[in-house]
């Protein structure tokens, strides 16, 4: 898929009395030409970042665990969660492709403190290297190398690769596409080898058991776990918001007018970043035809590449979990416990008995791969988001340039992560874990509200969302915030 930067950011010089689109409290957006859309059907694209962030412990552990606890009928909640995420993705893309701005800038146009809320939440939630633990622990099971060594080396390697890359987006898109392709095909093959058609049928049919909710799920022990699993059906926390930055760097829509972020080694070659985004002429039929082409392109991204891949990986892991319990009934009790690493190792052992020890190692390799995907995606996305907000809204930050700010945040979170891995709890201080979990889930409801405000107030009427789209995004806000606060007030627990 080629979404090259055409025209470049410097190709359209300002003219006197140029037309602009006034949106909110920031500088107006000059009118520019919308690039032609690429073919709708494609393989690679910015969605690989969302898949890398979204296909994690929710898909490989949390949902298989709930299926074993409450039966496959509980998966209707997963279907709602991941489908809702696909609609959120399309609405994030609406603003990013129409303006070349991130959703953070859109939030600032509505109410600048709203943007700073997301800035603070990102630091509070995503500086902890806990997402590395499962992958590194799985790698230790395979190789015997201590997981802390693997995690520290992995962090340094990520920093070096991103720093040396000429254009970070291009390198990361290719690497993540390869890793995710391996994960999708590999888990499907293992599931086919150890599972049965009965496992597949029950997993699929359970997604349509709408309304099923066993009484034992309405307890302080399990309702927060279900809330957490719904929040982690696909990308969680602020990961959808970061997707707008990857869209921009891919050159999607008006992002073609915005320079790409470069590695530190090539930061001096960076073009000047404009202080605001751009808008196309929504009264021009030719421009609107191109806009519809871009919407078809991103819809393919959302439905097939995001929704389809996330669903396939979750089905594969659920089939593996069901077959593991059938092969070794003792695995059920282990998976029902709270120790994620022990549960995954038990599943690997059961898979080994089904074929050979190689299969068990392959399964653990997939868990390690998930950890690597999450590390690459999270560190890049966090650094992009913080650099974007700092560059545009912190006085004096423009002197450093976007690429250098990206490098500062990247190496800052890497060094902090190394210190925590060596001297502290990888998931963060236990006393604030509930607060972090609350903020992560709360951010998802908050960005649904933000989307409604930004897309319905900051965009021209011809490209604003339809009423039914607003209803779905509004339902998302109620879905996330409603479950979160019900869990908090009914059971005194945030999420599990």
Where are these regions (language model features)?
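Hydrophobic alpha-helical segments and their helix-loop junctions in multi-pass secondary transporters
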Residues: 181-221, 226, 233-244, 447-460, ...
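Extracellular/periplasmic helix-exit of transmembrane alpha-helices
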Residues: 87-95, 271-289, 310-344
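Extracellular loop-to-transmembrane helix junctions
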Residues: 38, 65-90, 104-115, 149-150, ...
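Hydrophobic transmembrane alpha-helices that form the core helical bundles
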Residues: 98, 113-144, 151-155, 371-391, ...
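Flexible loop linkers connecting adjacent transmembrane helices
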Residues: 24-28, 63-67, 89-114, 137-139, ...
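Juxtamembrane transmembrane-helix boundary signature
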Residues: 50, 77-106, 116-129, 377
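Loop-to-transmembrane helix boundary motifs in multi-pass membrane proteins
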Residues: 148-153, 338-344, 358, 390-424
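Membrane-interface "cap" regions at the ends of multi-pass membrane proteins
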Residues: 1-61, 256-257, 263-277, 290-299
């Amino acid at each position: 898929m080629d979404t090259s930067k055409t025209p470049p950011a410097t190709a359209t010089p300002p003219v006197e009395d140029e037309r602009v689109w006034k949106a909110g409290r920031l500088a107006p957006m000059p009118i520019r030409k919308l690039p032609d859309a690429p073919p709708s059907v494609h393989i690679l694209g910015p969605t690989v970042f969302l898949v890398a962030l979204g296909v994690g412990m929710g898909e490989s552990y949390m949902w298989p665990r709930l299926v074993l606890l409450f039966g496959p009928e509980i998966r209707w909640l997963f279907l709602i969660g991941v489908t809702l995420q696909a609609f959120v993705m399309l609405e994030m893309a609406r603003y990013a492709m129409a303006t070349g701005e991130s959703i953070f800038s859109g939030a600032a146009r509505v109410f600048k403190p709203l943007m700073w809320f997301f800035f603070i939440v990102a630091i509070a939630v995503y500086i902890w290297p806990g997402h590395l633990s499962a992958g590194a622990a799985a790698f230790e099971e395979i190789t015997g190398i201590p997981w802390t060594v693997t995690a520290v080396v992995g962090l340094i390697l990520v920093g070096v690769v991103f720093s040396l890359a000429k254009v970070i987006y291009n390198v990361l898109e290719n690497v993540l596409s390869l890793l995710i392709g391996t994960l999708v095909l590999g888990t499907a093959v293992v599931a086919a080898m150890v599972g049965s058609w009965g496992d597949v049928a029950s997993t699929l049919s359970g997604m349509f058991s709408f309304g099923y909710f066993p009484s034992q799920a309405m307890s302080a022990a399990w309702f927060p776990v279900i809330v957490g699993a719904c929040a982690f059906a696909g990308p969680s926390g602020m990961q959808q918001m970061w997707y707008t930055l990857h869209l921009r760097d891919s050159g999607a829509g008006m992002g073609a007018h915005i320079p790409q972020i470069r590695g530190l080694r090539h930061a001096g070659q960076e073009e000047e970043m404009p202080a605001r985004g751009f808008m196309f002429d929504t009264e021009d039929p030719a421009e609107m035809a191109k806009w519809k082409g871009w919407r078809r392109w991103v819809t393919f991204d959302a439905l097939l590449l995001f929704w389809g891949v996330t669903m396939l990986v979750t089905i594969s892991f659920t089939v593996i979990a069901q077959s593991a319990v059938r092969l070794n009934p003792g695995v059920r009790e282990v998976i029902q416990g709270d120790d994620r690493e022990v549960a995954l190792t038990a599943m690997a052992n059961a898979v080994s008995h089904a074929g050979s020890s190689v299969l068990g190692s392959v399964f653990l390799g997939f868990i390690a791969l998930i950890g690597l995907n999450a590390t690459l995606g999270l560190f890049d996305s966090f650094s992009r988001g913080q650099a974007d907000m700092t560059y545009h809204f912190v006085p004096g930050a423009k002197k450093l340039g976007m690429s250098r700010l990206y490098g500062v945040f990247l190496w800052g979170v890497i060094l902090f992560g190394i210190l925590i891995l060596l001297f502290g709890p990888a998931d963060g201080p236990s006393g604030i874990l509930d607060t972090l979990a609350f903020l992560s889930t709360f951010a998802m409801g908050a960005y649904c509200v933000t989307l409604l405000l930004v897309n319905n107030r900051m965009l021209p009427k011809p490209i604003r969302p339809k009423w039914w789209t607003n209803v779905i995004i509004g339902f998302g806000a109620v879905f996330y915030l409603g479950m979160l606060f019900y869990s908090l007030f009914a059971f005194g627990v945030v999420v599990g």
